[in-house]
A protein has these predicted regions:
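Long, repeat-rich segments with strong aromatic
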Residues: 232-347, 359-382
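N-terminal export signals
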Residues: 5-25
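Aromatic-lined, polymer-binding surfaces characteristic
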Residues: 80, 91-92, 108-268, 280-303
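Low-complexity, Ser/Thr/Pro/Gly-enriched N-terminal "stalk/linker" regions
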Residues: 12, 26-82, 89, 93, ...
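An N-terminal, globular interaction/scaffold subdomain
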Residues: 83-89, 93-94, 99-108
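CBM-like carbohydrate-recognition segments
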Residues: 52-72, 123, 128, 330-413
Length: 413
């Protein structure tokens, strides 16, 4: 299906045009079904050029590589796995709902097929789009995001694959072990690869998982936040990487051993607190502080909040409907900024629009697809309270509109 027909199909489903922006001075008025359709429209717009190209073995041919001057040759070695692994990490829960006879179910059927074909292209040595899992440090990062995607969609991204592709994935993941992780959140990338191998019934290294868990427990700084290594960094890596991976690595280990049970309970409690903080960071206008590195990941900054909603682990302080409303405001504001996409639908570097100077040297086009993890709640069915409950103001809208509100408190653990 070409891009013109794809968007015609989306129009038939009622997924176009984009919903009206959330206005800070008025209540959120869009019906709940519009929110889901809007999120779906965003996901498809992000995913379409990437999966259409990769599924045909044309990703290298078609995907532009925007990066800092002088970094082109370096980033071309890694940007394609970045793009695919990160997109799948966010898209996986929606794909895992499977195909059905509904309009959305038929759309999922299309993208499940594209994702499965793309997976084959990514790990087949004979493919023109075979991806680099070994050269440089970056491939470990994105092998981990791809591994995380498989854990989030074990049926469509693993069980439904042919045995040859499964074995090629295992070989690719094991090959990433040649990369030594840094003494930082990178320990979790090695651990996530091993968690996938555990899931797949393959030889795995529990020590790599145990080390990552132990060090992050040591690096906890309090009130729901971990250091990135021994030091605290005021950025969004607690959400981009640390807490989503820590929760899910422990969740996978818990299927095989209860020895991590107490640690898991502690990590989830901390994640609930950090999700509370994330929701409070969203302003009445749908903005949030532009602090720290990797800002071009855009609303991927809210992966942890999105994951806690997906897993029904939000604290009692948060109603799922207010989380949906808050995230919708952020997504709309960021995705509708000018020049977010190029003329062929590929993401461009920026936080609010196209801002190439905001990128670090390690950022390239593929990096940007981490924004998709902000859309994780699409993995909840439309009947889930996250989608079905009436829209609700989020914390900052309530407080700044003058509503009385109880005090916020740190957790002491």
């Amino acid at each position: 299906m070409n891009r013109r027909n794809a968007f015609k199909f989306l129009s038939i489903l009622g997924l176009a045009p984009l919903a009206a922006r959330v206005q800070a001075s008025t209540p959120v008025v869009a019906p709940e079904i519009v929110d889901r359709k809007y999120w779906l429209r965003v996901l498809v717009k992000i995913a379409d050029p990437l999966l259409e190209s990769l599924s045909r073995g044309e990703l290298r041919k078609n995907m532009p590589v925007e990066c800092k001057p002088g970094m082109d040759a370096d980033r071309r070695k890694v940007t394609y796995l970045e793009a695919f692994g990160r997109l799948m990490a966010g898209m996986a829960p929606w794909l895992e709902l499977g195909a059905d006879n509904s309009e959305e179910g038929q759309l999922r059927k299309k993208y499940i097929a594209l994702a499965q074909k793309s997976m084959k292209m990514a790990v087949d040595l004979q493919s023109p789009d075979f991806m680099n899992f070994t050269e440089g440090g970056q491939p470990l990062v994105d092998a981990a995001f791809l591994a995380h995607a498989i854990l989030r969609a074990p049926n469509v991204l693993w069980k439904q694959l042919d045995e040859t592709t499964k074995q090629q994935i295992v070989v690719a993941m094991k090959s990433s072990r040649v990369i030594t992780p840094g003494y930082s959140n990178w320990l979790l990338f090695s651990a996530m690869v091993e968690a996938f191998l555990l899931f797949a019934g393959e030889q795995h290294d529990e020590l790599r998982m145990d080390l990552a868990i132990r060090k992050h427990m040591e690096w906890y700084k309090g009130d729901g936040m971990y250091g990135d290594g021994p030091d605290f960094h005021w950025d969004y890596y607690n959400s981009y990487v640390i807490q989503p991976m820590l929760v899910d690595i422990l969740g996978e280990l818990m299927k095989y051993s209860k020895k991590y049970e107490k640690t898991f309970e502690t990590v989830v409690k901390r994640a609930q607190r950090y999700a509370d903080i994330q929701e409070r960071l969203i302003s009445p206008e749908g903005t949030f502080p532009a602090i720290g590195r990797s800002l071009p990941y855009r609303f991927g900054a809210f992966q942890l909040l999105a994951q806690m909603a997906l897993q029904h682990r939000l604290s009692d302080e948060l109603n799922p409907a207010q989380v949906r409303s808050a995230l919708s405001a952020v997504i709309q504001r960021m995705i509708e900024a000018p020049d977010v996409f190029d003329s062929n639908g590929w993401l461009r570097i920026g936080f609010s629009g196209h801002q190439p100077n905001i990128a670090e040297s390690y950022i390239s086009t593929g990096s940007l697809y981490l924004c998709s993890v902000g859309l994780l709640p699409l993995g909840l069915p439309a009947s889930d309270p996250f989608w079905a409950d009436a829209l609700m103001d989020w914390t900052s809208r309530k407080i700044w509109s003058g509503q009385d509100f109880k005090a916020d408190h740190a957790i002491n653990d």
